[in-house]
């Protein structure tokens, strides 16, 4: 909200300067966006008198002026203004000055062969109005040589960010009230005298919609002259960013911006019958003042007469009943509209206005008569005329909230001990009535004050938030305990591990198109949003993979050659009773080239299912899963390639992860070309280890003795998974065998049909003493025996 310093001083008797006002407003919670001083741009322009004006020798529409700055050294200036003449006092821009309207820097130059040492300026060029038919004409006694900024005087414009909870500050008077309470001046009483009507109101005014419009007041003023408004009024409106239109319109805008009271003026000659606040009817429309026609719904409140709708109530007036220069009789409307109804109507019509911004926050219901008196007295003063009696339809909600308050709450809640007398002074200055028993009556213009904590806020912000004492937080002795939960620590661990493996974290939408979500639902019920941000994002994700696949597609289509993305987040399923069931997951997408083409590597190598498996096992290990006990089994899901995917399970039913190549049909659905490897870890299913909540890892002591490796080659049925054989070998001697890995899988010559040869490297770690041959043979026998339980034979 914008207003000038002079406007503020018209309602606040203060000696504070603009800087102090701006600082105090911010400390009161009315944050200053900017303070603009238009006169600052006029310091390079001077008051000057035209001594002579002669015709330009080379141009019919130009004159050569001799201009005096009062120093006895006239300057030659070429000017094309039709009103330039000898004796005129105007404004001269000297070389080096910057024209506010267009940013042009003035220079000494030759115009059609005649030297010009500056420019005589118009109102528009100086950014002071729209007049540009001639140069500015100042009074003849204006002091020559004075900067135009000093001649005009400084009138800074404040731009204040009003929060939604402060409708009382949507007018200059409300802001002045806060400043007065803070000690920066004395609030002037509202200069509104009650005007008695000299004749009955000729227009019937009523409300047929007490829910949307509880109170509707009106009066007619006849015999008005609707010309331009006075300069002081135009200056106020310009400072607020408003364009002066006519006296009647400008007066209603002045009362709205100055006192937070929107009103509307109708041309009586354009009305037909009674003016009624009612619900809109099916199929009705309104051509608003912005030139757009709006279709109305039956629950919307409108102002209408016998001919139809004239006004979208509380938001914008209609075009065909507005006032013009020919208006002689005017109907003033001052009403109270229900805030929720105004907000709903504005949202439905996508229509904003200054009036809507005030009505939907809540205007003062007790200000109807005062606001109407203000409008009437200003119109009679500026436009003349004769006022009718006031017609009052309905009753505004005038009941004031009474709150039981304890002044000790200022210290308990606000942290400042404010004397009871000072609290009573502050509240009184803000319009609150405080009884002896500290029952506080809330003013009608403060709908945001609902309880004692709100009263504390009023006291503290006016007393000064800078008065809150600085108190250090208490520190506990010793080392502070970690505050992260085990789930948070797990998430951090896995995130660091993924990043350390060269994966790039992505954060994608939790909402998905329904078709994408359905591909990953796996029989679970999808969880749809009742009010989605768009129709394409109305389903919560049942998996993190769709979002990552879309991100991979966008990156590949923009030239990326190797995609290594991961995301940690929650998948959303429909739980019992239709509630959301959120589960922590991690997903990885590998696409493009695993190894780029090069002279050493040859052709580019794509990612495969084993890359996905390696990522899954590494991340599960970091998450604390017992990877040595996991079984590799199929049935990863229809989204995966059936022959190049698997699951990692703890037992036959507990799936901790699934990995593998994406099914070609799924890849095509996401517009992905080439092989794509994916991983999905279900972090919520990983069993918690003892001490999982501890931050530090257990102490690691490196072995004192050297490890020993032994290789075994087993002939086994081709249907036996290598992982099963590897797990059997590891379990042969859990104390001595610390690692085992498959390093060869051979099928062909020398191996019977239906069999395969698996070569396994086993790492043995002595503890107390080195292994001798007997110990090594005993361990080897255990390994062979364990493998034999799966039908494997040692290959000779």
Swiss-Prot record:
Q: Where in or outside the cell is it found?
A: Cytoplasm
Q: Which InterPro entries match?
A: aa-tRNA-synth_II/BPL/LPL (IPR045864), B3/B4_tRNA-bd (IPR005146), DNA-bd_dom_put_sf (IPR009061), Fdx_antiC-bd (IPR005121), Fdx_antiC-bd_sf (IPR036690), NA-bd_OB-fold (IPR012340), Phe-tRNA-ligase_IIc_bsu (IPR045060), Phe-tRNA-ligase_IIc_bsu_bact (IPR004532)
Which reaction is catalysed here?
tRNA(Phe) + L-phenylalanine + ATP = L-phenylalanyl-tRNA(Phe) + AMP + diphosphate + H(+)
Q: Which UniProt keywords apply?
A: Aminoacyl-tRNA synthetase, ATP-binding, Cytoplasm, Ligase, Magnesium, Metal-binding, Nucleotide-binding, Protein biosynthesis, RNA-binding, tRNA-binding
Cross-referenced PROSITE patterns: B5 (PS51483), FDX_ACB (PS51447), TRBD (PS50886)
- What GO molecular function annotation could you give as one example from this UniProt entry? magnesium ion binding
Q: Where does Mg(2+) bind?
A: 448, 454, 457-458
Q: Which GO cellular component terms, listed alphabetically, does the Swiss-Prot or TrEMBL entry include?
A: phenylalanine-tRNA ligase complex
Question: EC annotation?
Answer: 6.1.1.20
What is the protein's major site of localization? cytoplasm
Please state every residue range assigned to the domain named B5.
398-470
Q: What class of enzyme is it?
A: ligase
Keyword Ribosomal protein on this protein?
Answer: no
Name any Gene Ontology BP term. Answer: phenylalanyl-tRNA aminoacylation
Cofactor(s) this protein requires: Mg(2+)
What are the FDX-ACB domain coordinates in residue numbering?
A: 703-795
Cofactor binding mode and count:
Binds 2 magnesium ions per tetramer.
Residues forming the tRNA-binding domain are 39-149
Task: Supply the Gene3D superfamilies for this chain.
Answer: 3.30.56.10, Bira Bifunctional Protein, Domain 2, Ferrodoxin-fold anticodon-binding domain, Nucleic acid-binding proteins, Phenylalanyl-trna Synthetase, Chain B, domain 3
Q: How does it assemble?
A: Tetramer of two alpha and two beta subunits.
The family this protein is said to belong to: Belongs to the phenylalanyl-tRNA synthetase beta subunit family. Type 1 subfamily.
**Would you tell me the protein name for this molecule?**
Phenylalanine--tRNA ligase beta subunit
């Amino acid at each position: 909200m914008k207003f000038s310093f002079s406007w503020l001083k018209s309602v606040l008797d203060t000696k504070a300067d603009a800087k102090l006002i701006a600082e105090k407003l911010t400390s009161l919670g009315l944050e200053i966006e900017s303070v603009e001083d238009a006169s600052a741009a006029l310091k390079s322009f001077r008051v000057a008198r035209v001594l002579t004006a002669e015709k330009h020798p080379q141009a019919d529409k130009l004159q050569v002026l001799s201009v005096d700055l009062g120093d006895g050294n006239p300057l030659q200036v070429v000017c094309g203004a039709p009103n330039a003449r000898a004796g005129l006092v105007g404004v001269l821009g000297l070389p080096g000055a910057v024209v506010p309207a267009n940013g042009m820097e003035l220079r000494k130059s030759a115009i059609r062969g005649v030297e010009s040492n500056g420019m005589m300026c118009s109102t528009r060029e100086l950014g002071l109005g729209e007049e540009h038919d001639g140069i500015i004409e100042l009074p003849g006694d204006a002091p020559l040589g004075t900067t135009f900024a000093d001649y005009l005087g400084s009138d800074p414009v404040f731009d204040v960010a009003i929060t939604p909870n402060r409708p009382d500050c949507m007018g200059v008077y409300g802001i002045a009230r806060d400043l007065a309470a803070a000690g920066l001046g004395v609030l002037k009483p509202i200069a509104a005298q009650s005007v008695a009507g000299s004749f009955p109101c000729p227009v019937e005014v009523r409300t047929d919609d007490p829910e949307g419009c509880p109170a509707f007041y009106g009066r007619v003023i006849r015999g008005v002259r609707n010309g331009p408004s006075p300069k002081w009024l135009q200056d106020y409106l310009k400072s607020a960013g408003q364009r002066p239109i006519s006296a009647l319109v400008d007066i209603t805008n002045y009362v709205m911006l100055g006192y937070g009271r929107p009103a509307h003026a109708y041309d009586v000659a354009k009305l037909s019958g009674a003016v009624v606040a009612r619900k809109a009817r099916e199929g009705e429309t309104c051509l608003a003042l912005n030139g757009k026609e709006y279709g109305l719904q039956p629950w919307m409140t409108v102002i209408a007469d016998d001919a139809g709708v004239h006004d979208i109530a509380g938001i914008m007036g209609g075009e065909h009943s507005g006032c013009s220069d020919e208006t002689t009789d005017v109907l003033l409307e001052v009403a109270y509209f229900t805030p929720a109804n105004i907000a709903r109507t504005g949202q439905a019509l996508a229509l904003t206005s200054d009036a809507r911004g005030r009505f939907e926050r809540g205007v003062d219901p007790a200000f109807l008569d005062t606001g109407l008196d203000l409008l009437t007295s200003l119109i009679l003063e500026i436009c003349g005329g004769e006022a009718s009696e006031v017609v009052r339809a309905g009753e505004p909600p005038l009941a004031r909230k009474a709150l039981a308050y304890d002044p000790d709450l200022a210290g308990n809640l606000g942290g400042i001990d404010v004397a009871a007398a000072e609290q009573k002074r502050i509240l009184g200055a803000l319009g609150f009535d405080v009884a002896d028993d500290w029952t506080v009556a809330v003013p009608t213009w403060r709908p945001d004050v609902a309880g004692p904590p709100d009263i504390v806020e009023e006291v503290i912000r006016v007393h000064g938030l800078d008065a809150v004492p600085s108190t250090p937080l208490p520190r506990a002795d010793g080392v502070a305990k970690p505050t992260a939960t085990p789930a948070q620590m797990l998430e951090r661990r896995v995130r660091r591990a993924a990043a350390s493996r060269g994966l790039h974290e992505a954060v994608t939408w939790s909402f998905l198109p329904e078709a994408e979500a359905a591909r990953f639902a796996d029989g679970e019920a999808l969880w749809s949003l009742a009010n989605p941000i768009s129709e394409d994002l109305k389903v919560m994700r049942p998996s993190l993979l769709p979002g990552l696949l879309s991100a991979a597609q966008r990156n590949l289509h923009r030239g990326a050659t190797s995609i290594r993305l991961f995301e940690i987040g929650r998948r959303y399923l429909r739980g019992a009773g239709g509630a959301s069931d959120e589960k922590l997951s991690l997903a990885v997408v590998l696409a493009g080239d695993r190894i780029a083409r090069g002279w050493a590597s040859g052709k580019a190598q794509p990612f495969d299912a084993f890359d996905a498996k390696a990522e899954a096992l590494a991340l599960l290990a970091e998450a604390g899963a017992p990877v040595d006990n996991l079984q590799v089994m199929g049935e990863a899901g229809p989204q995966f390639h059936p022959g190049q995917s698997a699951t990692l399970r703890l037992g036959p039913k507990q799936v901790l992860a699934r990995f593998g190549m994406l099914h070609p049909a799924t890849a095509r659905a996401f517009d992905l070309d080439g092989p794509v490897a994916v991983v999905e870890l279900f972090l919520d299913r990983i069993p918690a280890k003892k001490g999982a909540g501890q931050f530090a890892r257990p102490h690691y002591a490196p072995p004192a003795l050297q490890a020993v490796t032994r290789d075994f080659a087993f002939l086994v049925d081709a249907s036996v998974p290598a992982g099963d054989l590897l797990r059997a070998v590891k379990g042969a001697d859990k104390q001595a065998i610390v690692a085992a890995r498959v390093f060869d899988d051979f099928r062909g010559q020398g191996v019977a049909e239906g069999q395969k040869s698996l070569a396994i490297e086993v790492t043995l770690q002595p503890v107390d003493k080195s292994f001798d041959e007997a110990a090594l043979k005993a361990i080897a026998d255990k390994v062979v025996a364990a493998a034999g339980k799966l039908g494997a034979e040692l290959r000779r």
